[in-house]
Regions:
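Short, conserved helix/loop micro-motifs enriched in His/Cys and acidic residues
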Residues: 128-163, 251-275
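Regulatory N- and C-terminal appendages and interdomain linkers associated
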Residues: 2-111, 365-469
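Extracellular beta-rich repeat passengers
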Residues: 442-507, 512-823
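Internal "kinase-insert"/substrate-recognition segments embedded within catalytic cores
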Residues: 174-177, 189-282, 378
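Middle-to-C-terminal accessory/interaction subdomains
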Residues: 255-294, 301, 308-453
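Conserved oxyanion/phosphate-binding beta-strand-loop segments in alpha/beta enzyme cores
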Residues: 98-155, 561
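A conserved helix-loop-beta module that forms one wall/lid of the active-site cleft
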Residues: 154-187
Length: 823
């Protein structure tokens, strides 16, 4: 008998022996005897069962890996160092994190010099051959835009449950870490299948379209302390917002939660915690029957510096079975998260949460997508699970657990549909009144913000009457809405207009603001002047700028017509450099402001208005909102004229002249721009940050460092556009490290790019550029036949007439007509 036949025979014998032993344990021994055997000798039992599954593992190895493969190379001495340290420190939740050097190879073979450690507090993460890892990448060489990743065994996250939970989170509009499944090799040996997620970082925030100048909190270690009683129980993953050093935002949230008055709590909680996000976060947990984001762990709170509020981010949601009767338990446990409990104890808040829950449950396609995703994930990953021989469970256990968790997810949906879709849900339960006030050793004193980051917080919820008592230069109409003007009005200090009203600024009003004084409104502003009686915002100081005119989270659209904004008496000199930032107002309720006019989480319409001499980063800044700008002029601003982040809108018949930096700087934004003139910009005519879509029609860019900059994965369509006098006409490049390369796309049609001092167009390998029926002076390799290399002549460029004097290639190239914009 050959050696090969002997090995095959031995393998078959081992399988038969293991199978016989399994059958003996399962069918011969009664349950009271069988269970202790399995529990006490789980490792042996699993090993025997795994022997019977050798054919499945061998079959899986014949197939390509269905997931990315990572390779980690670590010196055995360093691995022993980690083993010894974690074994000695097991159970010590306050242990230091130690890292050792290693080399990481991505699926494409790229090498990264990294630092690694074991991840996790319990011994299950480092006592067995399949360990959990945290891998930290160098700042100058991020991995897929990530600073750090964690690899844990999938059983720790209920196999496919957490991936499904994060899939749901994205459908609900919640931020979430990027996750996935990977196969790991350590020092050339298989380490098995892992669940990967990125670590909490600025990069994670940016990937979720959240500003990195906020704060990101999580619990400090894994203890038994109530997170919602002290700021000392929280750590900061990101600490960039005003007051971060003393956790002023968190102190305010905890103080409001623990205030004895329900009226005070209900009035103020939505001004420090974004309740719309809270409802989505809570519904997300309910769908999994989860109580895992409780008072002691798994809390992730992001303070949004554009909104001045916290937002929950789901984390380690887990799964639970909603099988208790609705009358005795309901879906809102009374003892797991005090902030959840107190919010939902207020009937109007509870009804809003229930409305969102019903919307999700009533959408059959949305519900079906959850299970379709779960099932497809199982089918994709099953071969990788079968291949993994280091896992501490059998293939049968994996299949049964996946089926069991799916059944729980299904029962939870059915339970919620029965009680919250087909029946009237129960009313809110009363909050536990003794919790906020009593401590074993005496009266509880909640934390108090110690700095000035939230000086104006209680102004947000003022009534119009309370506001007028503090600001008698305003008035109120019979509808309860506020008015300012006409005539001259002086604001010597920052004034905050409360929510739930509207501010009307009358035609013919001159608002003089003292140095660094701001007007911040949590309600829509209606400022409609006329050509004869404009509204003007002017500096009171002859040398210093005023602060900002800001609109924050207003539910209705604000309108500005025939409004003149002058930030300083003369243009700030010198202009800001492209990488320099200048704060002109704040902190105001945890927010800083760099725009002369700032619109956040709101809609604005601007017509026939002028923005001049802005001293900060932007003349007009729109973040997480919408804009419609027509017939307006931006001139002599120190940095960017218009800046939009994660917004959408239109710009029509508008001029941007003599900007220190960019004419238009848009990031994560979708914009339609037509009949616009951008002249003499210090940096870019149009700057397109990541994930931006620009449609530019019949517009002119004259004299800029870069005419149109298209970064990362953005796209631009230029039709009947003109770019002259730039160092580079169109520049496509990689800018943001969270994107692996520049994959931008640009289409240029019926346009003219000429008089570039360095190069006409710069395009990297991974980007795409299509051109037709255009004049490209100097030409461009690979262009279509109707792309002409000539030097164009204009009718009167000095006077702003950029129409072609002659039309090589036909009348359809260049401007269709002369844009009529303010001079």
């Amino acid at each position: 008998m050959t050696l090969k036949n002997k090995w095959v025979g031995a393998s078959i014998g081992a399988v038969l022996l293991a199978g016989g032993t399994m059958l003996l344990i399962k069918f011969v021994f009664p349950e009271p005897v069988r269970r202790p055997i399995v529990n006490e000798a789980r490792g042996l039992y699993v090993a025997l069962e795994r022997l019977t599954e050798i054919p499945q593992s061998l079959t899986a190895r014949l197939k390509p890996l269905p997931v990315p493969a990572y390779r980690l190379v670590i010196d055995p001495e360093h691995e022993r160092e980690l083993d010894d340290y974690f074994r000695i420190q097991e159970g010590n939740l306050d242990r230091e994190k130690i890292y050792v050097p290693a080399v990481f190879y991505d699926p494409d073979g790229r090498r990264y010099d990294v630092r690694v450690t074991y991840r996790g507090d319990g011994g299950q993460h480092f006592r067995f051959p399949q360990k959990s890892w945290r891998i930290v990448f160098p700042d100058e060489s991020l991995f897929m835009g990530k600073k750090a990743i964690t690899l844990i065994y999938p059983e720790e996250r209920e196999f496919l449950v957490e991936a499904t939970n994060f899939h749901r989170a994205k459908k609900l509009g919640l931020a979430a870490p990027e996750t996935g499944f990977v196969y790991l090799f350590v020092n050339r040996h298989e380490a098995g299948l892992y669940y990967e997620f990125e670590h909490w970082s600025e990069e994670l925030l940016e990937r979720n379209r959240l500003k990195t100048d906020g704060n990101l909190y999580g619990e400090q270690g894994l203890g038994s302390e109530d997170l919602y009683r002290s700021t000392s129980h929280w750590q900061q993953y990101v600490a960039n917002a005003p007051g971060a050093e003393h956790k002023e935002d968190l102190a305010l949230l905890i103080a409001i939660l623990n205030h004895p008055s329900d009226e005070y709590f209900n009035r103020n909680i939505d001004d420090i915690l974004d309740l719309e996000t809270f409802y989505r976060w809570n519904v997300h947990a309910l769908l999994s029957g989860s109580e895992h984001q409780d008072a002691i762990h798994n809390a992730r709170l992001y303070f949004d510096p554009t909104l001045g509020k916290f937002k929950y981010i789901p984390w380690d949601v887990n799964i639970g079975d909603l099988e208790a009767p609705i009358e005795s338990r309901g879906i809102d446990p009374k003892d797991y998260n005090p902030l959840v409990l107190r919010i939902l104890a207020h009937q109007p808040f509870l009804e809003k949460r229930n409305r969102l829950l019903r919307e999700y449950l009533a959408d059959s396609e949305t519900v079906a997508d959850d299970f379709r995703y779960y099932d497809e994930l199982y089918q994709t990953l099953r071969p990788a699970f079968y291949r993994d021989t280091l896992k501490n469970y059998s293939n049968r256990f994996f299949r049964e657990e996946v089926a069991r968790y799916r059944d729980i997810l299904s029962r939870n949906i059915a339970y919620l549909q029965e009680h919250y879709l087909e029946a009237e849900p129960p009313p809110a339960a009363p909050a536990e009144r003794e919790r906020p006030l009593a401590e074993p050793d005496g009266e509880y004193a909640p934390p108090v913000p110690t700095g000035d980051a939230f000086t104006y917080f209680h102004d947000i919820s003022r009534s119009p009457e309370e506001f007028l008592a503090a600001h008698p230069n305003f008035s109120k109409d019979t509808a309860g809405e506020l008015h300012l003007g006409p005539g001259s009005v002086v604001l010597r200090a920052t004034t905050l207009v409360p929510e739930n009203t509207r501010l009307h600024i009358e035609a013919g009003t001159d608002v003089f603001l003292d140095a660094h004084a701001s007007l911040v409104s949590y309600s829509a502003i209606d400022a409609r002047g006329t050509a004869e009686r404009p509204i003007r915002f002017l500096p009171l100081s002859p040398t210093e700028p005023w602060g900002t005119l800001a609109i924050i989270d207003a539910p209705n659209e604000s309108r500005f017509e025939n409004v003149f904004f002058l930030h300083t008496a003369k243009r700030p000199d010198p202009p800001l450099s492209p990488d320099e930032h200048r704060t002109i107002a704040g902190p105001i309720n945890g927010m800083l402001f760099r725009g002369m006019v700032t619109v956040r989480h709101a809609a604005v319409s601007i017509a026939a208005s002028t923005f001049a001499h802005a001293a900060g980063d932007d003349a007009l800044s729109v973040q997480y909102g919408s804009f419609a700008i027509t017939d307006s002029l931006f001139r002599d601003n120190s940095a960017d004229a218009f800046d939009a982040d994660f917004a959408s809108g239109t710009i029509m018949r508008t001029a941007f002249r003599d900007s220190g930096n960019d004419g238009v700087d848009i990031d994560g934004t979708k914009a339609l721009v037509e009949d616009v003139v951008v002249t003499r910009t210090g940096d870019k005519g149009f700057s397109l940050g990541a994930s931006t879509e620009l449609e530019l029609k019949n517009s002119v860019i004259d004299t800029a460092d870069i005419g149109v900059a298209i970064k990362d994965d953005s796209s631009a369509t230029l039709t009947h556009a003109l770019i002259v006098g730039a160092r580079i006409g169109i520049n496509i490049y990689h800018d943001n490290p969270i994107f692996p390369a520049a994959t931008a796309t640009a289409k240029v049609s019926a346009s003219v790019i000429a008089q570039s001092t360095e190069r006409t167009i710069s395009v990297p390998r991974d980007a795409q550029l299509a051109m037709d029926r255009s004049i490209i002076e100097g030409g461009f390799p690979g262009s279509a036949e109707d792309v002409i290399d000539v030097t164009p002549r204009f009718r009167n460029a000095a006077a702003g007439d950029y129409r072609l004097l002659d039309a090589p290639g036909g009348e359809t190239i260049g401007l269709r007509y002369l844009p009529r914009v303010p001079r």
